[in-house]
Amino acid sequence: MSLADSVLAVNNDLPIRTDKPVHSGKVRSVYWLTDTDSRRLIRDKGYDVPEDTPLAIMVISDRISAFDCIFHGEGDLQGIPGKGAALNAISNHWFGLFAENGLADSHILDIPHPFVWIVQKARPIKVEAICRQYITGSMWRAYSKGERVFCGITLPEGLSKDQKLPELLITPSTKGILTGIPGVPAQDDVNISRSDIEANYQAFGFEKPQDIDLYETLLKQGFKVISDALAKLDQVFVDTKFEFGYVNDKNGQSKLIYMDEVGTPDSSRIWDGAAYREGKIVENSKEGFRQFLLNHFDDADILLNKDRMPEREALARDNDLPLDAMMNVSRTYIGVAEKVTGSSIPLPANPKADIIKVLREQYDLIV
């Protein structure tokens, strides 16, 4: 089989039994199971959730998105070899470490395959929970233009690009387009302040005001667990994005949990520690791919200017990226995953066929 065959690019066409539309995100697709199948799996697999909890199959792809677009490579390479398996392996490892440290639960109930999670339905918080330990990226771009207030936080004078911040900062943004919130534009990924959340906590999905403190605590705790573990590997945990939601426990009590992925090269910046001490930035995250794109195309403003989105979409659609650039990303993702987990990352030759086989034989979910 060719390299392209080993990439799972389309993940929303699996013959999984469902009575609802498949939700297709940039990287993952979600198949909501029937009530009958959800109840059967909860009973037969012994999942520690109420018997009427809706379950879903979440399938990751190898697609790569940057600047809100999906990119592809030469030779009909529609994704990054090993990327999906690497991302899931990293998240699985961190969620396990969270459990060992007594942090909150995640939405994951079972891992049938390197590309697949069985998850419980959650009521999502509509906040991208971003934590920053270093000034770089969008924060540095704003700071270098003279802005000193970022997400309601006043930054000190005299900061330099890529330096460690005096303290860990929480700089949230909106998750999805939210309407009717005073002072918050109805756009995706808009920076917001803690005071915005406090004044409109229900609009952001919080069930009670005290949970704002809880989400910040869980964010800081999760950041510290990952940062401490990466430091032992001489890697710098620069910044990251977490997501949270509510589920009910077996007693019907609502609880806040971690959702989506955590501490991955997609959701975080990770720098090589040795290089950083020498004054250089070596990216072990998707940021390296973003920088490649900014240098690869003649007009980088297309990638940065939200008013040029149609041009950006055409740029991504009409350009095959060099194979070596795609494989560099593959090596980065697999390398980080193997460092973090201490294990090799299995790369199926035909991931779609493998997923169908497992879900048919072990879960009876294939039609």
Swiss-Prot record:
GO terms for cellular component: cytoplasm. One of its GO terms (molecular function) is ATP binding. Pathway: Purine metabolism; IMP biosynthesis via de novo pathway; 5-amino-1-(5-phospho-D-ribosyl)imidazole-4-carboxamide from 5-amino-1-(5-phospho-D-ribosyl)imidazole-4-carboxylate: step 1/2. GO terms for biological process: 'de novo' IMP biosynthetic process. It catalyses: 5-amino-1-(5-phospho-D-ribosyl)imidazole-4-carboxylate + L-aspartate + ATP = (2S)-2-[5-amino-1-(5-phospho-beta-D-ribosyl)imidazole-4-carboxamido]succinate + ADP + phosphate + 2 H(+). NCBIfam families: PRK13960.1, purC_vibrio. This is Phosphoribosylaminoimidazole-succinocarboxamide synthase. It comes from Shewanella frigidimarina (strain NCIMB 400).
